[in-house]
UniProtKB/Swiss-Prot annotation:
Serves as substrate adapter subunit in an E3 ubiquitin ligase complex zyg11-cul2-elongin BC. Targets substrates bearing N-terminal glycine degrons for proteasomal degradation. Keywords: Leucine-rich repeat, Repeat, Ubl conjugation pathway. PANTHER family: PTHR12904, ZYG-11 FAMILY MEMBER B, CELL CYCLE REGULATOR (PTHR12904:SF22). Belongs to the zyg-11 family. Pfam families: ZER1-like_2nd. SUPFAM superfamilies: ARM repeat, RNI-like. It comes from the Eukaryota. InterPro entries: ARM-like (IPR011989), ARM-type_fold (IPR016024), LRR_dom_sf (IPR032675), ZER1-like_C (IPR055142), Zyg-11_UBL_adapter (IPR051341). LRR repeats lie at residues 128-149, 154-177, 178-199, 209-231. This is Protein zyg-11 homolog.
Amino acid sequence: MEESSPKSLLDITLLYLSTHLEKFCWERQDGTYCLQDAAIFPQEVADRLLQAMAVQRQLNEVTVGIFRGNQLRLKRACIRKAKISAVAFRKAFCHHKLIELDATGVNADITITDIISGLSSSKWIRENLQCLVLNSLTLSLEDPYERCFSQLSGLRVLSITNVLFYNEDLADVASLPRLESLDISNTSVTDITALVACKDILKSLTMHHLKCLKMTTTQILEVIRELKKLNHLDMSDDKQFTSDIACRLLEQNDILLHLVSLDISGRKHVTDKAVEAFIRHRPQMQFVGLLATEAGYSEFLSGEGCVKVSGEANQTQIAEALRRYSERSFFVREALFHLFSLTHVMDKANPEMLKLVVIGMRNHPTNLPVQLAASACVFNLTKQDLAAGMPVKLLADVTHLLLEAMKHFPNHQQLQKNCLLSLCSDRILQDVPFNRFDAAKLVMQWLCNHEDQNMQRMAVAIISILAAKLSTEQTAQLGAELFIVRQLLQIVRQKTSQNMVDTTLKFTLSALWNLTDESPTTCRHFIENQGLELFMKVLETFPSESSIQQKVLGLLNNIAEVKELHTELMCKDFIDQISKLLHSVEVEVSYFAAGIIAHLVSRGEETWTLSSSMRETLLEQLHSAILSWPTPECEMVAYRSFNPFFPLLACFRTPGVQLWAVWAMQHVCSKNPVRYCSMLIEEGGLVRLHRIRDHMCADPDVLRITITILDNLDRHLKKHGNPPCQKPPFTK
């Protein structure tokens, strides 16, 4: 499937061009754009550029100017959701030799009569335009207005749904000499008798949800009987009416004998027996729409055979429904509701189904019932190991839409819960590209407004992972939001008072650890909100929980790195607590305790406000503790950069401080050389290590580890060459 393949070079180029037009254009006197390069684009490329601009919502008065001349020759034009005037439309598009135009949902400044008037100004378009889509537009701002559809004599396909389109307009359309396909869904038509005028040419008729229709069932059937060429008929509805039209139609054996496709989804009184009999009288039939009816449950109508079925009885029918009804919110919701029921237990990933859910979500971003059902389906389709079988690009699309749903419905608890359940996936959080900064903010906002314990655990788990993936700048920006630190500290306070060690506490500590990393503002928020006192309480409450101690000390390391907060840590009780943990048998605990001491001691005697004898004792203990550490079997810590270590490397008067810094560097460079050797070289670590190697008074233990690091760096350079400029992501 396409989601598992990289984008084509053309797609990447057109996406960039469509979103950075200002770099490739000059401005005319009227402010519109004109491409700088005079090269002529191939017609297919021009069509795709226009479509890319439409998808990216980049079509406006200024940007459509690039289509005025002959550099970009259009044939199939998509201007969906464009924000343009009638004048801009005429200048940009009406000189092209168009055979198709999709103007769905263009802004209210341009009407259907404006569009047809512009198109009709070209003799070529009048005679050759074949397909015109004018859904969700205003017909005219004038009353009365001149009906003008008949001017487009070459038109074969017309879609004019969700429009105040009346019987007289239908009569005008029915006079088109080549009209083969017509969609008048959700219009104001009350009488379809005018369609008899095109009975000998009309092959496809879609009239979904004709809510204003005032004809009797018999009268409707009489018109349909006349449409002898019809091979597609859509009479579906949103279950709002009790009309017996579907039931009566299925009883007719002598009409629609050439029918290939019939859609009666949402209609009443439909049975499997009647549908099956209707199809058997028309063996050429290929599709029947039965969603939101009582039919579709027989083996004959399963959708697995020659006849495709949109329905709710099985996943095949539901997939067909999602494909065909992606722009009909009611049917999308119905299909998703039944999909959720059928996907509680899945043993195999289904990317095709997830793609259909994505399309439904994207087409109806502000429809709560759709988003609610879709987010629930996303969870079923991606939970546990199922996400591993999904293409990354597809998961990226899903994640973006989940975040959009959270933004649109911030106060709907069930929808927020659905989205969090789906986001709480290692595959998504670790491997999928999406805006992690926005996601972290959204989840934090949810966390601050809800107290559901199960959801709280998920939220802090998500935040702890997201925070580790952010850049230093993003982490600082996120941590600068005071409410975030305050809320996380409140969770820690609650768990500590309950004497409870659980995953929520661990994830919350990890989140705070990651948020304070190389972020002085967040560290200050931590101190100002009594974080230090709280964390000392945590250490006292859980004296035998090494995993808790490690996270607490890791965060306190981040605080100790901030020079401006040095005095906040110059507290005897605090130093005594850290000194005890320096002697922990757990190397991970001792390591972080040593880091705190190293940073505090490194700033010199003049900044040490406690007793000098304590400082000397700590330095001795620091040195001996480091030398006692066994080599860890795995990487026990991760760093964004080595910048916090560099000041420590210059502390020749306190070799214990240097020793901790080089031990840390050696540890990560030996466990993950590709990442950390490159980082150390890139950040200028070689020069600093050379200074230690060449210093006459370098401590032997420090010198030994320094030489080991330099040897590792030398091997790395020989194997990989100079490191790239881009840094790898950070995780903790």
